[in-house]
Amino acid sequence: MKNEVAISTSHLDAGATGTGLTYKDAGVDIDSGNALVQAIKPLAASTKRPGADASLGGFGAIFDLAAAGYSDPLLITATDGVGTKLKIALDSGIHDSVGIDLVAMCVNDLVVQGGEPLLFLDYFATSRLQVPVASAVVKGIAEGCLQAGCALVGGETAEMPGMYGNNDYDLAGFAVGAVERSQLLTDDRIGLGDVLLGLASSGVHSNGFSLVRRIVERSGLAWDAPAPFAPETTLARALLTPTRIYVKSCLALHRAGLVHGFAHITGGGFWENIPRVLPQGACAHLDGLSWPFPPVFRWLMDQGGVSAHEMARTFNCGIGMVVAVPADKAEAAIALLGEHGETVHRLGTIAARGEGEAVIIDHLDEAFAR
């Protein structure tokens, strides 16, 4: 894989003359690819951090773990995309925020195991490279990396005629993080009686957008119409609000010794994501009345006729990260998270599971009906 953004397709004779074909005739514009590389080099350089210089141009990126302060590190990797949220970006022509989503979906997964994001790479695939669009996307990626404290060390831009609609593109992100072996967060740290805190989301984040788009279609609203749940902005802008990046607040909590575990609430909602970090025989007992149900979710629920249970298994419903903390340290954890800009809600506790479900949410229908 090339560290610089590269054009990746099968080879044609780019030097043909006369009636012979060129690479550009086949739909691949090398000059546009080179122009993109030059446009995004300063963006990548802005994400430089100890251990990585974030300069593009080599065949591979090098990271110095010792320079980053690690002595006995474990590496943690994550990869993800933005899903069909991209369709809203494409339909509305708003491309400057989905890059933040791409980074968020990867780095928020790293922090669940106590990992500090170190470096990030992206894959941008399209049928026809549009430099302004790709530059806007990468600008968002660089902003996400700055928020997460990781270096954007490279990526791949694949211009593949015929693979996508004329102006469509797809994204994938790849993040690498590290944690000292003794600080790895595993499910055996979580115990009965632990308090569950919820960190507020910034909106829908980056999952459930196939349902979101179906609901918008049913509503008959255009993307540039005022959002019914946020009339000060357009529907597209409101739904494209980027995924919140929780890295710095959660790492601060971990380094202070105030956390037993995290669960990133993405696809599958509470029902699918919280059990991924629970020890055998434990359940998460939440009170649905303990946090506010944001207006965007109320509108989606009402407009689509979506049940409360379906909402909670599809969307984050206002909580983007669940945090398990020792009961005697809950207030200290809430205070520290607040100092780092998080809005924190006390959701419930870890209890014995017995024969029941791994996640119990009391008053769910009542809460979502408010």
UniProtKB/Swiss-Prot annotation:
Gene3D superfamilies: PurM-like C-terminal domain, PurM-like, N-terminal domain. CDD domains: PurM (cd02196). Pfam families: AIRS (PF00586), AIRS_C (PF02769). GO terms for biological process: 'de novo' IMP biosynthetic process; adenine biosynthetic process. Its main location: cytoplasm. GO terms for cellular component: cytosol. It is found in: Cytoplasm. It is an enzyme of class 6 (ligase). SUPFAM superfamilies: PurM C-terminal domain-like, PurM N-terminal domain-like. Its EC number is 6.3.3.1. One of its GO terms (molecular function) is ATP binding. Pathway: Purine metabolism; IMP biosynthesis via de novo pathway; 5-amino-1-(5-phospho-D-ribosyl)imidazole from N(2)-formyl-N(1)-(5-phospho-D-ribosyl)glycinamide: step 2/2. Keywords: ATP-binding, Cytoplasm, Ligase, Nucleotide-binding, Purine biosynthesis. It catalyses: 2-formamido-N(1)-(5-O-phospho-beta-D-ribosyl)acetamidine + ATP = 5-amino-1-(5-phospho-beta-D-ribosyl)imidazole + ADP + phosphate + H(+). Belongs to the AIR synthase family. This is Phosphoribosylformylglycinamidine cyclo-ligase. The lineage of its organism: Bacteria, Pseudomonadati, Pseudomonadota, Alphaproteobacteria, Rhodospirillales.
